[in-house]
Structures are given as C-alpha cells and as structure tokens.
Curated annotation (Swiss-Prot):
Coiled-coil regions listed: none
Keywords, sorted A to Z: Glycosyltransferase, Magnesium, Pyrimidine biosynthesis, Transferase
NCBIfam families registered for this protein in UniProt: pyrE
Name of the protein this chain belongs to: Orotate phosphoribosyltransferase
Cofactor(s) recorded in Swiss-Prot or TrEMBL: Mg(2+)
Annotated pathway: Pyrimidine metabolism; UMP biosynthesis via de novo pathway; UMP from orotate: step 1/2
Catalytic reaction(s) noted: orotidine 5'-phosphate + diphosphate = orotate + 5-phospho-alpha-D-ribose 1-diphosphate
Source lineage: Bacteria, Bacillati, Bacillota, Bacilli, Lactobacillales
Amino acid sequence: MSEIAATIATDLLTIKAVTLRPNDPFTWASGIKSPIYTDNRLTISYPAVRQHIAHGIAAIIKREYPATEVIAGVATAGIPHAAWVAELLNLPLIYVRAKPKDHGAGRQIEGVLKPGQKVVMLDDLISTGGSVLQAAKAVQAAGGDIQAVGAIFSYALDAATQNFAAASLPLFSLSNYPELIKVARQADYIDDEELASLHTWRQDPEHWGVTD
C-alpha cells in the first residue's frame, strides 16, 4: 500500500466521507445494493485533508504527466480540487459540465482551452467512469489532448477499467476501494466477516446482496 493511498483512505474514513455498511447496505440510483457510500464533497471543509489531496495529485501529474498544460475540473465536485492543483502547479484551470448549459451561451466548458493543449481532468470519485468520460468527450471535441483522468478515490470496479480502456484514457486515483477496506480493517472500523463481504461486493457488485 502506498503512503498516499493509506493517508487518503484514513482521511476519508476519519471525516466520514466514506461510510461502510456491509450489514445494512445502501441502494444506488441504479438499484445496485452497495456496502459503501462516498461523499467526497466533505473533503473541502477540512484544510489538512484537501492539502493531502492537492499535493498528492500534483505530485502524480508532475511525475507522470509533466507536459500537462491545463487542469480541468469536472463539475461540480471536481472543481475545487482542480483549482487547488492548478494553483500548486501554476497552470490554467477550466471546468467541464456533464452537458452544455441550457441558457446563456450554452457552454459546456468554462475557461480558456486552446486546441492541442494537454489536459489532465480531475473528479472526486470514479465508479464506472460514465460521467467523467462524457465530460472528457467535450474536452476532446474542443481540441483538448487529454493526458489522463485523475480522482481522489475509485471503487476500482472492472466496469471502470473497461470503460477507460475503451476510451483510451489513462486513469489514476489517490486511493481506492481495496486500499480503503484494508485500512478500515487495520483501524477496526470493520471486522473480518465484514471485510470478506466487502471484498465480495467488488467482485460482483450487481449481484451482491441479492437474495432469491
């Protein structure tokens, strides 16, 4: 487990941005039963946590994508973190809506993006990647050259891996579901039986918790 992955996992559990409830699961809008609920918007209210996030993402971009010219935040939860990362890297910032505005100029992208500029897109959470990939299409249509998509946390689902591979876009996250449940067990947030159930969910989220 990398130091930053463990730090972010601990942060998310401590501020209750992530709740684990394998014995009393949540129901997603899609109808899927889930033992985890994530609200990374809470991170903006904790200066130390948001600094860990901004510095962690900035370090990855400097190391892996040094040619990056623009940071793009995905509306709305990705915007504040993208702004802090852009500030650390002294790079331009844009943000991208899931769809164009239905009034005014009808823009989907706010800020200045020049054709050919190299972009790293940032969001708070990756489940299957559907919303951020829609935003990525808008950036590409505007001439942006997307280097990667980054996030604070990923559920590390096979569906996301497949979707990003199909889009030919690299994906990185500071922490992920396997790392988080490992940290949760070490800190006694969950017991061994709950850990086993949490592992099972990630292997087959659509059928986990479904009884005949």
